[in-house]
């Protein structure tokens, strides 16, 4: 069974890291409205653009999404 993007992102958490994807994961953990079951790029991207003040650049999401795709293949 394929994991959701959120489930993958939680594997990237590291509160002591300066890596932007890991910081994104740390912040998403505390986002109670994050679409936790989604595997859809457009749905998650739209959500982040509208709601994620903790994400300074969408290029961080793009990098995290690429890591997700690589891990799922």
UniProtKB/Swiss-Prot annotation:
InterPro entries: UPF0346, YozE_SAM-like, YozE_SAM-like_sf
This protein's name: UPF0346 protein Lreu_0775
Domain of life: Bacteria
Disulfide-bonded cysteines: none
Matches recorded under Pfam families: YozE_SAM_like
Family: Belongs to the UPF0346 family.
């Amino acid at each position: 069974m394929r994991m959701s993007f959120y489930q993958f992102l939680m594997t990237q958490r590291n509160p002591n890291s300066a890596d932007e994807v890991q910081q994104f994961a740390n912040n998403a953990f505390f986002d109670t409205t994050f679409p936790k079951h989604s595997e859809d790029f457009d749905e998650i991207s739209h959500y982040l653009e509208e709601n994620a003040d903790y994400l300074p650049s969408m290029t961080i999401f793009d990098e995290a999404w690429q890591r997700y795709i690589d891990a799922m293949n």
